[in-house]
Structures are given as structure tokens and as C-alpha cells.
Amino acid sequence: MTMANQSDMKVHDWLAHPTRRSYHEANFYPSLDPAQLPKRFVDGTDMNLFQGYAITKQTASPGNIEPLLDHIKNIWCNGDAVTYEYTLNWMARVVQKPWQRTRIVLVLISKEGVGKGMVTDILGEILGSQCFLSESRKDNLFGQFNSSLSCKTLVVMNELLWAGSHEASGVFKDMITDKAITVNEKHQVQRQEDCYQNYAICTQGPWAVPASCESRRFFVLEPSDRYCGNQDQESTQYFNRLATVQPKHVADFLYKRDISSFIASQVPETKALTGQKLESLTPVQSVLYEALIEGHVFCIDSGGWDKMGNPYQTTGHFGASLQRSQILEGMTQASAQMRSDKHHVPQKFWRQLKSACTAKGETILHDQGRVRNSSSGVRAHYMRFSPLDECRAFWEKHCFVPPGGWPQETDENLVTPESANFDVFESADPTKSP
């Protein structure tokens, strides 16, 4: 090895040099404070790849950020105080304590042009290019080569839709909570790196996240579309004012914000999150939810077929004993997706239905076994759902409250064309308007 202005130096001479620095491994821990760093980084055993945020607590300075706060409160959060406070606390946590992951994904679903990116871009300027990533290519996040995720504390995913991709959904759920990531860079040896990524998703699509009924990983907002679309004088002035906010002033606000009582896992339940759960329902869950909305169980009468060749559709009452075969046929017929699924078999249906009806030791589906019908004398396998009120309460507790609540029963008669009185028109001249 030849070094400039120096005599030839062999590798073994460099290895034997008393001031040569060596490490057991290189890893990532987002702090430069010796009091906060793990011992292996302080004593030099491991090399810390973290270089510090672009705007530190020392380089941040106070200034006017009211346009930004107003935007987050009234556009992002539609004036809701609870979600506004949570949003600011979530951001402050990423800035103040990046070594403590929120493990909660911030999701923004809206039309184009509402100003989602203006806020995340400011966060990116605070964190710097080493720790911030804004990505719209799915392969760079979930593909074979993922080195772009290395050393990141905030990853913003732009316009990434799941569209039923269970594989990507499973990978992403693991990424949110995993303690370590395998970094795979082209032409390099794979290595393990500790995870400190927080995630945000900005999208226009209806299905933004794979939010199952029991999901607690997502904080979902639907920003107002007040200023989106073609820009007029009002919206132009609004965004020009927002653009005057300086990242160093936002950094000062976030560094100084008190988050001592913030618990990231206590995510506000939003209507937008409920919408994502509805989008993510499995076919069996969807049919069960529709049955709870309608107030009866979908069944198929095994007694025959109508003139069109369709099986007789009957309704079963919640709380009543129903034949197992009739429930299977009725719910399958109620779901076009299940009807078209070549791999849909009874065993799969019952496994999914029992899973949908059971949570934390509670169940609303009861197997009564094979019993003889006292009137017909026929022995059949019967199941029973809990009463409707109990089933709806179970769904609210373990899934979500339906948008607008459950339908209310009423004694009022619905006026239909068949029941309306058209006698006044029957004797009128059909060529003249009544």
C-alpha cells in the first residue's frame, strides 16, 4: 500500500500501528449523548453510524411557526384537538427521542394538493438526509435490496397502495415493530442493523394501510380538501404563508415540546382508521359485519330452489339455533368473493368465522353439536350466535364502531311506489302532465 508523501506501508504495518482504530461491528443508534449511548459505543467496541440530525437542539432557534401549526390543526386534523395534540407529540418524539420508536404509523389520506408534503419535507430538513427518506418505489422498501432503509428514523411512503397484497402487508407490519433489520446492499455482504425507523404514509388511495380489526399500529387522518385543486387567490396566499415557516423554528418548537406524558400506543380512534379497517376486512368478516348491520344471519334453505335456479334465501335470528350447513351456504352466497374463490372450502370458512367471532377469551359463536329436531325428527349440526345486542357490543369492543352507529329500528312504514296512492293520475290524460 502506498500513501501520498509517505514511504510504502504494508498491511501488517497498518494493522500493528498503535493508533489504528478497530471495531467489533458497525451499527446504528440515533444519539450522540454519551449518557444515552449503550456502553459498546462509548468504550469503542462498536462503531455508531449515526452522524446527528441536520438541525440540532443547539442550532435550532425560536420563530413564528403559526402557519404550520394552523395547517396541522385545521387541515390535517380538521380542527380536532385530540388528534392535533397526538400529531405534534408524535413528531416531537421522533425529533427528541429517536432511540424510542413510536411503533405507530402516521397515515394521511387525502386528495392531491392539501399540503401533506410541505410538513413532512420540513421534518426531512430537520432530520437530514442520513435519517430521513421519502420513497414512492415499493421495491426500495420491500424488495430484495433495502439499503435505503439503513440509518433512518423517519421514512415517508408516498402513494403506496396495498391492493390486497398480503405479502407486502405482512412485511410492513413486521417492519413497524422489528428490533433489527437485515440490510442488503448490492455487491455487499448482508448485515444486521438495529431498527429505529418511524413510518408515515401519504396517499390519495382508499386503501392506504392493512389495518385489521385488532390493529393498533396506525394513526389515520383524512386532511381537509379546503385548499386542494386549482389554486385561487385565497389558496395561493395560504400556501405562500405556509412556505415562510423555517425548519429551524419548527425544530426549536419540537425540541422544547413537553412529551413526558405522551404514550404513543394510546392512538386516537379516528373515522379514517375505521374506514381502513372496513377496507381490510376479510370476506368472512365482511359478511358477518353486514349481518350485524342487517340484524339477521344469512342462511340458505336446504328445502329447494326457486324458478331461476337460485337457492331459497332465508334469514336466521341472532340468538337462535341454526343449522350449520345453512349458515355456511348462506354466508358463502352473500359474498361474491367467497363464491369465486376456487380454494374456498368449508374448513377454511369455519376457521375464519370462528376467528372473527372470538377475541380475548370471548366468543359470540356457539357450537351446539348434532341434535335432533323435535318437530321433524331429523338430526343435524346446529350453531348459535349470541343475541344481536351482544354480537354488536362484541364487534364494537374488538373491531370498531360502525360509521354512524348501528341502524335503529323504527315502527314507521316506508313509503314505496307500490304503497303510494297514484289514483289521481290514473284517470288523467296520459298526454298531459299532471
Listing of model-derived features with the role each one plays in the protein:
Residues 38-156, 163, 168, 219, ...:
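P-loop NTPase catalytic core of nucleic-acid-dependent motor ATPases
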Residues 153-176, 208-215:
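Conserved AAA+/SF3 P-loop NTPase catalytic/coupling segment centered on the Walker-B
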Residues 169-191:
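Conserved catalytic/switch belt of AAA+ P-loop NTPases
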